[in-house]
Regions:
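Glycine-rich phosphate/diphosphate-binding loops that line cofactor/substrate pockets in enzymes
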Residues: 72-89, 120
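Short, glycine-rich nucleotide/cofactor-binding loops
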Residues: 59-67, 94-105
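Membrane helical hairpin/interfacial module
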Residues: 101, 105-152
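An acidic, phosphate/nucleotide-engaging active-site surface
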Residues: 134-201
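Core alpha/beta catalytic barrel or barrel-like domain that forms the active/cofactor pocket
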Residues: 84-93, 122-137, 152-163, 252-258
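Catalytic cores of enzyme domains
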Residues: 170, 176-181, 189-268
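N-terminal amphipathic/basic leader segments beginning at the initiator methionine
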Residues: 2-64
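Buried hydrophobic positions in well-ordered alpha/beta secondary-structure cores of metabolic enzymes
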Residues: 87-91, 111, 174, 187
Length: 268
Protein backbone atom coordinates (compact mmCIF):
# COMPACT_ATOMS: atom_id res chain seq x y z
CA UNK A 1 0.00 0.00 0.00
CA UNK A 2 1.06 3.58 -0.63
CA UNK A 3 2.55 5.45 2.32
CA UNK A 4 0.59 8.69 2.36
CA UNK A 5 3.30 10.32 4.46
CA UNK A 6 5.60 10.22 1.44
CA UNK A 7 3.28 12.41 -0.59
CA UNK A 8 3.96 16.12 -0.64
CA UNK A 9 2.51 19.12 -2.41
CA UNK A 10 3.60 19.21 -6.07
CA UNK A 11 6.88 20.92 -6.84
CA UNK A 12 6.07 23.57 -9.40
CA UNK A 13 8.23 23.87 -12.54
CA UNK A 14 9.89 27.17 -13.34
CA UNK A 15 7.68 29.77 -14.95
CA UNK A 16 7.37 29.66 -18.73
CA UNK A 17 9.91 31.97 -20.36
CA UNK A 18 9.64 34.05 -23.53
CA UNK A 19 11.48 32.33 -26.39
CA UNK A 20 11.57 32.46 -30.16
CA UNK A 21 11.32 28.66 -29.98
CA UNK A 22 8.18 28.45 -27.86
CA UNK A 23 4.73 29.87 -27.40
CA UNK A 24 3.96 33.11 -25.61
CA UNK A 25 4.08 32.41 -21.84
CA UNK A 26 0.72 34.15 -21.46
CA UNK A 27 -0.84 31.21 -23.33
CA UNK A 28 0.27 28.76 -20.64
CA UNK A 29 -2.83 28.69 -18.46
CA UNK A 30 -2.14 25.64 -16.33
CA UNK A 31 0.77 23.39 -15.41
CA UNK A 32 0.57 19.62 -15.02
CA UNK A 33 1.60 20.04 -11.38
CA UNK A 34 -1.67 21.89 -10.82
CA UNK A 35 -3.90 19.04 -12.00
CA UNK A 36 -6.05 17.33 -9.36
CA UNK A 37 -4.38 14.55 -7.41
CA UNK A 38 -0.82 15.48 -8.34
CA UNK A 39 1.86 15.14 -5.67
CA UNK A 40 5.64 15.08 -5.34
CA UNK A 41 7.80 12.37 -3.80
CA UNK A 42 11.08 13.34 -2.18
CA UNK A 43 13.93 11.13 -3.31
CA UNK A 44 15.79 11.67 -0.05
CA UNK A 45 12.87 10.05 1.77
CA UNK A 46 12.77 7.12 -0.63
CA UNK A 47 16.56 6.69 -0.62
CA UNK A 48 17.97 8.00 2.69
CA UNK A 49 21.53 7.16 1.61
CA UNK A 50 21.54 10.01 -0.92
CA UNK A 51 23.99 12.80 -0.01
CA UNK A 52 22.62 16.16 1.14
CA UNK A 53 21.99 18.77 -1.54
CA UNK A 54 23.10 22.37 -1.78
CA UNK A 55 20.33 23.25 -4.23
CA UNK A 56 17.31 23.21 -4.10
CA UNK A 57 17.38 24.66 -0.62
CA UNK A 58 16.63 27.78 1.35
CA UNK A 59 16.68 31.34 0.09
CA UNK A 60 20.47 31.41 0.39
CA UNK A 61 21.02 28.13 -1.51
CA UNK A 62 22.48 29.79 -4.61
CA UNK A 63 24.76 31.95 -2.46
CA UNK A 64 26.01 28.79 -0.73
CA UNK A 65 26.58 27.13 -4.09
CA UNK A 66 28.63 30.12 -5.23
CA UNK A 67 30.80 29.88 -2.12
CA UNK A 68 31.28 26.12 -2.56
CA UNK A 69 32.28 26.69 -6.19
CA UNK A 70 34.75 29.43 -5.26
CA UNK A 71 36.34 27.23 -2.58
CA UNK A 72 36.92 24.45 -5.11
CA UNK A 73 38.11 26.76 -7.87
CA UNK A 74 40.63 28.44 -5.58
CA UNK A 75 42.39 25.06 -5.25
CA UNK A 76 43.10 24.88 -9.00
CA UNK A 77 46.55 25.82 -10.29
CA UNK A 78 46.00 28.71 -12.70
CA UNK A 79 49.51 30.15 -12.47
CA UNK A 80 50.10 29.66 -16.20
CA UNK A 81 47.29 32.11 -17.06
CA UNK A 82 48.86 35.56 -17.32
CA UNK A 83 47.11 38.94 -16.79
CA UNK A 84 47.43 39.99 -20.43
CA UNK A 85 46.02 36.78 -21.87
CA UNK A 86 42.46 35.73 -22.76
CA UNK A 87 40.28 32.89 -21.45
CA UNK A 88 37.13 31.35 -22.92
CA UNK A 89 34.79 29.62 -20.48
CA UNK A 90 32.98 26.94 -22.50
CA UNK A 91 29.42 26.01 -21.58
CA UNK A 92 26.66 23.82 -23.02
CA UNK A 93 22.91 24.24 -23.19
CA UNK A 94 22.22 21.09 -21.12
CA UNK A 95 23.49 22.83 -18.01
CA UNK A 96 20.88 25.55 -18.30
CA UNK A 97 18.11 22.93 -18.22
CA UNK A 98 19.15 21.61 -14.80
CA UNK A 99 16.97 22.70 -11.86
CA UNK A 100 15.88 25.89 -13.57
CA UNK A 101 19.31 26.81 -14.89
CA UNK A 102 20.39 29.04 -12.00
CA UNK A 103 22.91 26.58 -10.50
CA UNK A 104 24.79 26.24 -13.79
CA UNK A 105 24.78 30.00 -14.25
CA UNK A 106 26.23 30.34 -10.74
CA UNK A 107 29.04 27.92 -11.60
CA UNK A 108 29.85 29.90 -14.74
CA UNK A 109 29.94 33.15 -12.75
CA UNK A 110 32.13 31.62 -10.05
CA UNK A 111 34.51 30.22 -12.67
CA UNK A 112 34.90 33.67 -14.17
CA UNK A 113 35.42 35.32 -10.79
CA UNK A 114 37.99 32.76 -9.66
CA UNK A 115 40.05 33.19 -12.83
CA UNK A 116 40.12 36.97 -12.40
CA UNK A 117 40.87 36.69 -8.67
CA UNK A 118 43.70 34.17 -9.00
CA UNK A 119 45.38 35.35 -12.20
CA UNK A 120 44.61 39.02 -12.70
CA UNK A 121 43.40 38.15 -16.20
CA UNK A 122 40.58 40.50 -17.18
CA UNK A 123 39.76 39.18 -20.65
CA UNK A 124 37.48 36.31 -19.58
CA UNK A 125 34.71 35.42 -22.04
CA UNK A 126 31.81 32.97 -22.26
CA UNK A 127 31.18 30.71 -25.26
CA UNK A 128 27.96 28.69 -24.87
CA UNK A 129 27.06 25.88 -27.28
CA UNK A 130 23.62 24.68 -28.27
CA UNK A 131 21.46 21.58 -28.57
CA UNK A 132 18.83 21.36 -31.29
CA UNK A 133 18.09 25.09 -31.55
CA UNK A 134 20.88 27.12 -33.03
CA UNK A 135 20.43 30.31 -30.97
CA UNK A 136 18.98 28.97 -27.73
CA UNK A 137 22.00 29.78 -25.58
CA UNK A 138 21.79 33.41 -26.63
CA UNK A 139 18.47 33.40 -24.77
CA UNK A 140 20.01 31.65 -21.76
CA UNK A 141 22.83 34.20 -21.63
CA UNK A 142 20.30 37.03 -21.40
CA UNK A 143 17.92 35.16 -19.09
CA UNK A 144 20.57 34.66 -16.42
CA UNK A 145 22.17 38.09 -16.99
CA UNK A 146 25.46 36.52 -18.00
CA UNK A 147 25.91 39.21 -20.65
CA UNK A 148 25.80 41.86 -17.93
CA UNK A 149 28.00 39.82 -15.59
CA UNK A 150 30.78 39.27 -18.12
CA UNK A 151 30.49 42.70 -19.72
CA UNK A 152 30.01 44.04 -23.25
CA UNK A 153 31.30 41.80 -26.01
CA UNK A 154 32.37 39.02 -23.64
CA UNK A 155 29.56 36.50 -24.22
CA UNK A 156 28.53 34.58 -27.32
CA UNK A 157 26.17 31.76 -28.12
CA UNK A 158 27.81 29.47 -30.67
CA UNK A 159 26.16 27.03 -33.07
CA UNK A 160 27.42 24.19 -35.29
CA UNK A 161 26.76 26.30 -38.39
CA UNK A 162 29.15 29.03 -37.23
CA UNK A 163 32.63 29.43 -38.74
CA UNK A 164 34.74 26.37 -38.08
CA UNK A 165 38.35 25.60 -37.34
CA UNK A 166 40.16 22.40 -38.42
CA UNK A 167 41.60 20.33 -35.57
CA UNK A 168 44.15 17.63 -36.36
CA UNK A 169 43.50 14.50 -34.31
CA UNK A 170 44.72 10.91 -34.21
CA UNK A 171 41.76 9.92 -36.41
CA UNK A 172 42.20 12.73 -38.93
CA UNK A 173 40.92 16.27 -39.33
CA UNK A 174 37.84 17.13 -37.28
CA UNK A 175 36.20 20.53 -36.96
CA UNK A 176 35.50 22.74 -33.98
CA UNK A 177 33.73 26.08 -33.79
CA UNK A 178 36.27 28.86 -34.30
CA UNK A 179 34.84 31.19 -31.64
CA UNK A 180 35.23 28.48 -29.00
CA UNK A 181 39.00 28.46 -29.48
CA UNK A 182 39.65 32.17 -30.12
CA UNK A 183 41.33 32.71 -26.73
CA UNK A 184 44.72 31.80 -25.30
CA UNK A 185 43.08 29.39 -22.84
CA UNK A 186 39.83 27.45 -22.57
CA UNK A 187 37.99 26.26 -19.46
CA UNK A 188 35.50 23.39 -19.77
CA UNK A 189 32.44 24.19 -17.62
CA UNK A 190 30.18 21.12 -17.48
CA UNK A 191 28.09 18.89 -15.19
CA UNK A 192 27.59 15.26 -14.15
CA UNK A 193 23.87 14.98 -14.86
CA UNK A 194 22.97 11.60 -16.39
CA UNK A 195 19.75 12.43 -18.23
CA UNK A 196 21.51 12.24 -21.60
CA UNK A 197 23.02 8.86 -20.72
CA UNK A 198 21.19 7.27 -23.67
CA UNK A 199 23.58 9.12 -25.98
CA UNK A 200 26.80 7.60 -24.69
CA UNK A 201 26.31 5.11 -21.83
CA UNK A 202 28.59 7.38 -19.78
CA UNK A 203 31.55 6.61 -22.04
CA UNK A 204 33.62 9.81 -22.15
CA UNK A 205 30.62 11.88 -21.06
CA UNK A 206 32.96 14.35 -19.39
CA UNK A 207 34.37 15.47 -22.76
CA UNK A 208 31.31 14.94 -24.94
CA UNK A 209 30.82 18.70 -25.61
CA UNK A 210 34.10 18.78 -27.53
CA UNK A 211 32.38 16.67 -30.18
CA UNK A 212 28.98 18.31 -29.81
CA UNK A 213 28.48 21.78 -28.29
CA UNK A 214 31.94 22.96 -29.31
CA UNK A 215 32.03 21.24 -32.73
CA UNK A 216 31.08 22.15 -36.28
CA UNK A 217 28.16 20.30 -37.81
CA UNK A 218 30.44 18.14 -40.02
CA UNK A 219 31.95 16.60 -36.89
CA UNK A 220 28.95 16.84 -34.60
CA UNK A 221 26.82 14.85 -37.04
CA UNK A 222 28.92 11.73 -36.41
CA UNK A 223 26.80 11.21 -33.29
CA UNK A 224 23.54 11.08 -35.18
CA UNK A 225 24.08 10.51 -38.90
CA UNK A 226 27.31 8.56 -39.29
CA UNK A 227 28.27 6.18 -36.49
CA UNK A 228 25.45 6.54 -34.00
CA UNK A 229 25.59 8.07 -30.52
CA UNK A 230 27.61 5.39 -28.76
CA UNK A 231 30.02 4.41 -31.53
CA UNK A 232 30.88 8.08 -32.14
CA UNK A 233 32.12 8.81 -28.62
CA UNK A 234 35.72 8.58 -29.78
CA UNK A 235 35.36 11.79 -31.82
CA UNK A 236 34.93 13.97 -28.73
CA UNK A 237 37.83 12.25 -27.00
CA UNK A 238 40.00 12.63 -30.10
CA UNK A 239 39.31 16.36 -30.26
CA UNK A 240 39.91 16.84 -26.54
CA UNK A 241 43.21 14.94 -26.65
CA UNK A 242 44.43 16.70 -29.80
CA UNK A 243 47.62 18.79 -29.48
CA UNK A 244 45.69 21.92 -30.48
CA UNK A 245 43.04 21.60 -27.76
CA UNK A 246 45.51 20.47 -25.10
CA UNK A 247 47.67 23.51 -25.85
CA UNK A 248 44.73 25.69 -24.82
CA UNK A 249 43.06 23.58 -22.12
CA UNK A 250 43.45 25.18 -18.68
CA UNK A 251 41.09 23.23 -16.40
CA UNK A 252 37.50 22.08 -15.96
CA UNK A 253 34.78 23.03 -13.48
CA UNK A 254 31.89 20.60 -12.99
CA UNK A 255 28.53 20.90 -11.30
CA UNK A 256 28.05 17.63 -9.42
CA UNK A 257 24.41 16.66 -9.74
CA UNK A 258 22.43 13.87 -8.11
CA UNK A 259 18.90 12.77 -8.99
CA UNK A 260 17.65 15.03 -6.20
CA UNK A 261 19.69 18.20 -6.72
CA UNK A 262 23.15 19.77 -6.80
CA UNK A 263 25.47 18.02 -4.38
CA UNK A 264 28.72 19.87 -5.02
CA UNK A 265 31.31 21.29 -7.40
CA UNK A 266 34.52 19.72 -8.69
CA UNK A 267 37.30 21.66 -10.39
CA UNK A 268 40.61 20.36 -11.70
Amino acid sequence: MCNENLKHAPIMPIAAKPSQYGIDPSLVKRRVAELPGMCSLRLAELFPELPPVIYPGGQDALDKLYQVAMEELRKVDMSFIKPGQSVNILASHHGFTLLGGQPYAILIKATRDAIIEKTGCKDVRLRAGVGMRFRETEEYIRRYQLDEYFGPGKTKGVAPIDEGIPIETEVGTLYGIKAVYDADWIVHCHHTDVREVHFHRQVDKAVKPFGMSYARIETRSTYHQNLGPRAANFTARAIFESPFVQSKFAFASFLNVGPHGVIGVDAD
